[in-house]
Amino acid sequence: MNNGIIVTHNGGNLETEDADVLIKYLNEKLASQYPGIVKFITGIQYRHLLIIKGGNKYVDCAPPHDHPNEEWKPLLVKPMEGVDEALLAGNCDKTPAEDVAENGGILSDEYRMSAQQTADLLNELILKSQEILESHPFNVARKERGERMAN
C-alpha cells in the first residue's frame, strides 16, 4: 500500500522465509492481544492463514488482488448482506475478551461471534497490523532500499 492505495496484493514478491519472520512478529505483537482467539499461520510467499476461534463465517472480505490501485478503506470487512439474521447473530451477549477472561484464558468451544463482531475484529487486525508491520526492521530496510513494504 502507498498513501491508502493498494499497490500490489503480494507484499512486493515476498519470499516465504521473510514472510515467516513477519507472521511470527504479528503473533507476538498482535495475536497476543487476543489470547485464545487469534492466530496467524505462515503459508507460502504472501499467502497466509488467520484463525479466529469463534469467528462468524458470514462476512464479506474483499480480495486485494481484485482491487489494485484502489483505496483500501472502502474495502474493509462487513457482515454479509442478504443472509438470514440467525446466521449473522452470535450466540452470546459477552464479547470474546469477556468469554476468554471467564474461561481461564481460552475462548469457550461454544462461543460464536456475530458477523458484526467478526468484521470488527478483522478490521481491527487489518489496521493494527499495518502499524506493526511498518515499523518492523524487515520493512524499514525494504523501504530504505526503495522496495515495497510487506503490509
Regions found by a protein language model. Name each.
Residues 1-151:
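…; additionally, a secondary subgroup of soluble metalloenzymes is captured
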